[in-house]
Amino acid sequence: GTEGAADVTLKGVVNLKGTESGTEIVVSPLRRESVVLQVYDKSGREIAERRTDWSPGKPFRMEVPVSPDSLGRVMASGVELWTGRDKTLSRPMVAPGDFNWETAYGQWVRGQYLVWLRNYAEAEPFARKSIGYDPCYVPGLNLMSVLLLNRNDCQGAFDCSMRALAVDTYDAQANYLMGCAAMRLGRTDDAMDGFEIAALTNEYRSAACTQLAKLYVRDGQYAEGVQYARKSLIGNAYNIEGLKMLYMASDCLSEDAEAVLSAIENCDPLNDFVRFERYWADPDEKNRTAFQSLIRNEMAVQNYLELAIWYYSIGQVGRAEKVLSMSPGDAETAYWRAYLSQDRELLEKADVSDVSFVFPFREESVPVFEWAMKESGNWRSAYLLALVH
């Protein structure tokens, strides 16, 4: 390793170590690439240059004949890895003493910070106090909607968003959140309405157009899906979800979209969607192995489940069933397979599956377990449903 860190960049972790003859520069690369490493002193004079090939997990070492105090900058192919200048920022770290936290805005700020930290349960009291101070405070209503969506109270989130829209019908966040809640509630027209208004703004255009593409693909309107997927990429070319929707809509229109798959692969080389789609298009053993061989983590079943649920969310049940049939499987997967096929025999198998160390957390699994409870009444589906809540 680097035995410490002087700086961290998107190219790698860098450390400088003083030696008897100068300074050893150690870089632990984050990606495989060929680079030109250039070292400058504090006057800006280049004192060393080396071309090298980097690979993750293989630290690169280079020694220069000057002390660490004399170094000014280390560059890698035009990207700064380390600098000797003072990078202390001027951003304030303490709130003004005369700021009144006991206001709708003050409580919203506290709640919003906690949401950014993903402390949703701790954020909710502040959101409630915010709209308690002012029941028509739109940011507070939006924050409450976010928190209700997070715990799958879609109707509550929808109601909060509608109250915000009653105050400001063009508020972008309220429209987007209303669309998300309506989408989960099956209120497709309301969802489209919210996303269309949210898409008028730069902040929400990409996300809203991505959601609209999903709705159109799910409804079988693939040409509209293509249009909105393309719009989602304007100003956000690395929107992988938008690229996936562009591929799906194009594929459903029997259009060649291999270039889209390649674009996703360039952005995210380990994306399971890319490898599965190549297997789906050509289901031979080579493509099957290529898909499954890179799912190597300790909870591989979650990769399969996540991909299958995504396919199901856009109406691609056949693909979802195929993904789950290739999964190592667990109790949640078993219930999903029974639900997708509405198969009594698969449900009976799920009802005797081992639920040890199975901890469902996705809201999409709620209707699956509710269906299983209604169909068989086995304790396992009730237990797993309770874990989601």
Give the location of each predicted region.
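Alpha-helical segment of the N-proximal tetratricopeptide repeat
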Residues: N100-Y133, N303-I314, V355-P360, L384, ...
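TPR alpha-solenoid repeat register
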Residues: G140, A174, A208, G242, ...
